[in-house]
């Protein structure tokens, strides 16, 4: 069976056909390539004395690469990885002439170490797409291994506690079971962890553990947390956002 995050290839194919250049344009933040909250947090992180000021950066789940291109304006050379071959092709097309590279790769696989060592690793909303505990453990362990000693890991992810009343109002048709969101999909049975609810099939879409549980996952992989920001749910967004910077 397929991993739920492998469905991103179909989404990027649809984006390409519609002329949509980045995930934010397609999803939550209309018309913005890198949203203001992300820029604010990354700007604060990059200003810290414990943050590398130059070197090699890798973005995990880079999509079409807007965040990586933004970071690489700050004296970094970059590599973006993603499981979607269409996303990687789009990223390469949008990054011609810049000091960034892209390749198809899966951060949850053991062979990810072949991509090299880095001073900075950034997860721009990839983690919450990884559902199974086994894959999340691999995500954190592999991220640690990709960094040089003293390298910095930045995670930005959705988390709980969620406002379930707002979820019902805002996320029409979706389900929230425990710490996993599910979306209706006719081919859900092709994917790990699908659910059948009232005669309809749903596939896992997002894993949103309690923010304290995510901090525990980060520490268990060997990271030292240096900075974190946590936003509350709102009437427009039932899930919370966690941003963390941690040293390897």
PLM segments and residue spans:
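A short acidic, Gly/Pro-enriched loop at the edge of an enzyme's catalytic core
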Residues: 112-121
